[in-house]
């Protein structure tokens, strides 16, 4: 697949790049993407939820009333899970939600995500650029010129650029990442993947 390279003004530079078919034209594996995204979202969970059991809540040491003769159901503690103020029965406890996905499956998932974006015409290539100062306006203007101002955009960079990443931080629908760090979730969670031209080589080194 060939794509025209645009500049930050949104005009064609006259240059054309060829996307690697091994990355941008593979058969899309929805199952691999499902496994990877599921693991990514699960691994974000802290797992620090906790409810106290009847052994951990305060009070309840004394039998509330005698065993027989009151007409009430027998109770040995006011902190039973059946009582108001009692401990939780099988309540949530701290745990890890981490899931492991094999490297080959992760690679396939990322290739599938990029291939799906390419097939849908949701990949744009812009010539390499840099800004002198940390300002939101130049990045916002670039997105507007490219027709991406209202679209959820993933900007893929060839390397970390503090000026660009910080400048784009205040733009709600923009996510700036180094190409080899973008996950399957990041790709699928965007409407358009905007590649700096140099980032294509970076992604080929990672997934090629």
UniProtKB/Swiss-Prot annotation:
Domain of life of the native organism: Bacteria
Keywords in alphabetical order: Ribonucleoprotein, Ribosomal protein, RNA-binding, rRNA-binding
Function, as annotated: One of the primary rRNA binding proteins, this protein initially binds near the 5'-end of the 23S rRNA. It is important during the early stages of 50S assembly. It makes multiple contacts with different domains of the 23S rRNA in the assembled 50S subunit and ribosome.
Pfam families hit by this protein: Ribosomal_L4
Keyword Ribosomal protein carried by entry: yes
Upper classification of the organism: Bacteria, Pseudomonadati, Chlorobiota, Chlorobiia, Chlorobiales
GO-annotated cellular components: ribonucleoprotein complex; ribosome
GO MF: rRNA binding; structural constituent of ribosome
Family membership noted in the UniProt record: Belongs to the universal ribosomal protein uL4 family.
Region called Disordered, residue ranges: 49-78
UniProt GO BP: translation
Assembly behavior: Part of the 50S ribosomal subunit.
Entry protein name: Large ribosomal subunit protein uL4
InterPro entries, per the entry: Ribosomal_uL4, Ribosomal_uL4-like, Ribosomal_uL4_dom_sf
Regions of compositional bias (Polar residues) in chain numbering: 69-78
